[in-house]
């Protein structure tokens, strides 16, 4: 069976891993890095992904970051006159990770396990699955990030019984999950989180601080200057990382703006204490879901065996201190917070292919599911933290006499009134036979699959008429839209490959021009001048083609010059060999002469032994 790769599709960074020899391994990208920035840039119809896209974000307004925060919404970003959905941008990142995996494995990759924040709702999960399809991947399973981290951690510890808290503070989302490990079973007991809290928010408080300080000093608001804001974002991210290792850092941004007297520079020392002061509210926001998860699991903090930190933002000392204070446990530092989720996804891929045996994963639905009933009340059918996959049915009736149809309004959330929860979808069960209110028996069934994706069925028990819906959120893509995006992604991948080949061809041509100059110089006076002239003429023809950027002409001229240079190189080699042979012959004659000169005449006398 072909390999199933594990992908951590992160807000700020993404990572891909695979099972090899019974161990999950992170696949490095072409630059040799183990994580890839979740950044996409468009420049003259060319798409750039990762570090190269992030590097030019300051000067390129068509750079898209943190798109994961918009998954499952109707948000669109316009680039070069075309609208892109979050699914399409995520698909470009996934294509890049898929290409890295294919280069590493030396085979085509078509299947993946992709992770999502535990607190992602149905629309966000469906959007992630669609992104995978657009990227040309069959998404075999969507699993929760904290659960994936626990899988990677617990793979070697299957014989131990442990209660684990996974605290996952990523670039844009926060999750906390409580799990029990026993005999290879990873059972999620509860989960909680905040999909609008992460490292980006810690960057933002530093940016706000820098903007306020600069405004106080120069009366200029940098937040209105797009380019200055991007420079501030880069500086804030760097300062945040620095302050995990040192107690103060220098932020220096020359020529950040200009005043009446000329250019203005931003120079500021940020201490860890100041950073902790301005980010204290964010750290506190992570503790409420942590307490809720513990309460839902029915565990006291003292019952926990391990606290595992996941996500780059857990390197912040104040975050580590807060979770230590809350649980009374020193956080476990034996996993790499940037890679452990992708490793866990690879383990789940191994479970699905049969490469990993004896592992059972029992996850939960993070939010309650139900329908709207009379008076706008939210009636729950499946409570949050129910183990999935699961199915639950309940019988309802009509609210008016002779009601011909019922509207089924499907919701997800925890609030008592429907209006305060997230609408997943609506559908109708029609053609109900006339009957007094309260008489028809309408059975509503909710199914949640292993990916956490919802199907809802309504059935009139009197007539057996049935209506089924796979929840498609307002932002959800139809199959036709996904198919169109798949084709676009494939054609763009072909175009990207073509552009890559073009760049390589130009590079090879430039290299050949340089090599020709060197060979011609080495052969001056050693071969027929006509041959040198022929090489020079072919070189100039290639240079002209390079300047015109005529790719087919470059290819033809390059091949012609290559042949001439090869012939000249052979001659150069033969001359070098001949010269070496002559030198050897001369040296041999010299050595022989030297031996003759050194001959010594000696007299000898035969001595006969007496017998």
From Swiss-Prot:
Biased composition range(s): Acidic residues: 600-611
Keyword ATP-binding attributed: yes
A GO MF label: ATP binding
Modified residues (Phosphothreonine): 173
A family per Pfam: HSP70
Span list, region Disordered: 579-611
Family recorded in the similarity comment: Belongs to the heat shock protein 70 family.
Name listed for the protein in its UniProt record: Chaperone protein DnaK
Organism: Bacillus mycoides (strain KBAB4)
């Amino acid at each position: 069976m072909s390999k199933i790769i594990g992908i951590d599709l992160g807000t700020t960074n993404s990572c891909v891993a695979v099972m090899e020899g019974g161990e999950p391994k992170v696949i490095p990208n072409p630059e040799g890095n183990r994580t890839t920035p979740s950044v996409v840039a468009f420049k003259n119809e060319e798409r750039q992904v990762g570090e190269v896209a992030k590097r030019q974000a300051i000067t390129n307004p068509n750079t898209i970051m943190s798109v994961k925060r918009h998954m499952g919404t109707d948000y669109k970003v316009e680039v070069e006159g075309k609208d892109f959905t979050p699914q399409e941008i995520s698909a470009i990142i996934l294509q890049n990770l898929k290409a890295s995996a294919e280069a590493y494995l030396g085979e085509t990759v078509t299947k993946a396990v992709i992770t999502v924040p535990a607190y992602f709702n149905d629309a966000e999960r469906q959007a992630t699955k669609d992104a995978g399809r657009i990227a040309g991947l069959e998404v075999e399973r969507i699993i929760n990030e904290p659960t994936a981290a626990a899988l990677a951690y617990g793979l070697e510890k299957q014989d131990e019984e442990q209660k684990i808290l996974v605290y996952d503070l990523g670039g844009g989302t926060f999750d906390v999950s409580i799990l029990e490990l026993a005999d290879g079973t990873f059972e999620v007991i509860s989960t909680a989180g905040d999909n609008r809290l992460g490292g980006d928010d810690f960057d933002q408080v530093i940016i706000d601080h820098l903007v306020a300080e600069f405004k106080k000093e120069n009366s200029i608001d940098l937040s209105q200057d797009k380019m200055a804001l991007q420079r501030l974002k880069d500086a804030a991210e760097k300062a945040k990382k620095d302050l995990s290792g040192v107690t103060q850092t220098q932020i220096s941004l020359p020529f950040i703006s200009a005043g009446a007297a000329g250019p203005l520079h931003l120079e500021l020392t940020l201490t860890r204490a100041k950073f902790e002061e301005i980010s204290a509210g964010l750290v506190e926001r992570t503790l409420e879901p942590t307490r809720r998860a513990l309460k839902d699991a029915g565990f006291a903090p003292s019952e926990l065996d391990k606290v595992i930190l996941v996500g780059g933002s857990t390197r912040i000392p104040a975050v580590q201190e807060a979770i230590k204070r809350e649980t009374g446990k020193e956080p476990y530092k034996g996993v790499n917070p940037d890679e452990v989720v992708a490793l866990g996804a690879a383990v789940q891929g191994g479970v699905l292919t049969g490469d990993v045996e004896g592992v059972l994963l029992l996850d939960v639905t993070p939010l309650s599911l139900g329908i709207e009933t009379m008076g706008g009340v939210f009636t729950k059918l499946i409570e949050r933290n129910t183990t999935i996959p699961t199915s639950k049915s309940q019988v309802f009736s009509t609210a008016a006499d002779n009601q011909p149809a019922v509207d089924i309004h499907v919701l997800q959330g925890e609030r008592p009134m429907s209006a305060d929860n997230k609408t997943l979808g609506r559908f109708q069960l029609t053609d109900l036979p006339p009957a007094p209110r309260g008489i028809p028996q309408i059975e509503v069934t909710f199914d949640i699959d292993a990916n956490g994706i919802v199907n809802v069925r309504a059935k009139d028990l009197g007539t057996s008429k049935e209506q089924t819906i796979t929840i498609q959120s307002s932002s959800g893509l139809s199959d036709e839209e996904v198919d169109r995006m798949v084709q676009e992604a494939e054609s763009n991948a072909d175009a990207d490959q073509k552009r890559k080949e073009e760049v390589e061809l130009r590079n090879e041509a430039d290299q050949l021009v340089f090599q020709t100059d060197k060979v011609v110089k080495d052969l001056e006076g050693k071969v027929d001048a006509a041959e040198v002239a022929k090489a020079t003429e072919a070189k100039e023809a290639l240079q002209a083609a390079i300047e015109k950027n005529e790719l087919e002409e470059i290819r033809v001229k390059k091949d012609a010059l290559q042949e001439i240079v090869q012939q000249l190189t052979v001659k150069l080699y033969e001359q070098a060999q001949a010269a070496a042979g002559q030198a050897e012959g001369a040296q041999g004659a010299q050595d022989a002469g030297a031996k003759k000169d050194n001959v010594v005449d000696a007299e000898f006398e035969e001595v006969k032994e007496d017998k």
